[in-house]
Amino acid sequence: MKRWIVAAALGLATAGGIVTPGTAQASSGAWYRVYQADVPGSFNQTAAISKTNIWAVGDTYTTAGKTIYQPFVRHFNGSSWRAITIPHSSGSTADWVSASAASNVWVGGLKNNSTATTVVYRWNGARWVKIPVPAVTYLQGVIALAPRNAWAFGSSGTEAYDIFHWNGSKWQHYLANYINFIPQDISASGPDNVWVSGFAYSGSKQVVAAYRWNGAVWRPVSMPHPVFDDAGPDVTAVSPSNVWIGWYDTTTSHALHWDGHHWHTLTAPYYADPLHIVPDGKGGYWFGAQAILTGSTWTAEQVPAFTGGFGDVTRIPGTTSFLLNAGVEAGGSSTVKPTIFRFDL
């Protein structure tokens, strides 16, 4: 899901150095800015197909700070970022992007109305095609695995919480809210390994829970069910034997790791974001933009000092380079502008 960390002259270092529970190191890399659009707004999400095919979507605002309902889309072709116009898309936002190939790029957002209806467009390599969405249906966290295979969670006019599947012609409903499960995030490593994380109620408490699609049916995951009371839980499915679920409670960051046989519990340092866990390509994992976990060692990373906010980390496939979508004040102005940072390990 789209979540932001707000920064004000952001940095991790304190007068006494980096504060960590245990060993922390510093890498030789650094986040650096690679693109900033000259409009008020922010990037919500990026999707990298290759180092020469990257998509970014976001929101733009009026000078009064109101959202402009027109999808804000940028594409990187390996040498430059260019503006992309989706025909006949006025009246909607661009909240998320998902891509499995150059001919399968999905962009979605909300209509400018009071019914919370999602609008979805797919780039097929030649043109944009509008994907039909039932009225009063709100799709979040869409994972586009193929032109005829996409998963999402959200709500509809009949169900408060549900999981949806696109089969090439329509959206099908799977899990409904009567099962006592409220989805919060979705991730997939392939068509037979799709995970949805969320929470259930145990008495008056919220506990972490998950479901997995094995290619044929959704099943509840046998796992620990810790209590949480803040943000998450979010999921990263790297493979059937490598899955991470992260969340916050009031004071601490937590994660569960599935190694194919057992669940392992992890408490993360304060600068680690358990809602954005991404493999680093070297056997470690980014926890947001400011922490890398390799084995049991945490590496603290700094984002450049700025005022604004940033979202999730995206790995560029086939590389150890990463992108960070953000909204950053620039040029001495208080106007936040859509910005992309990059990190090379």
PLM-predicted stretches and their roles:
Residues 26-345:
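Residue-level hotspots at or immediately adjacent to binding/recognition sites across diverse folds
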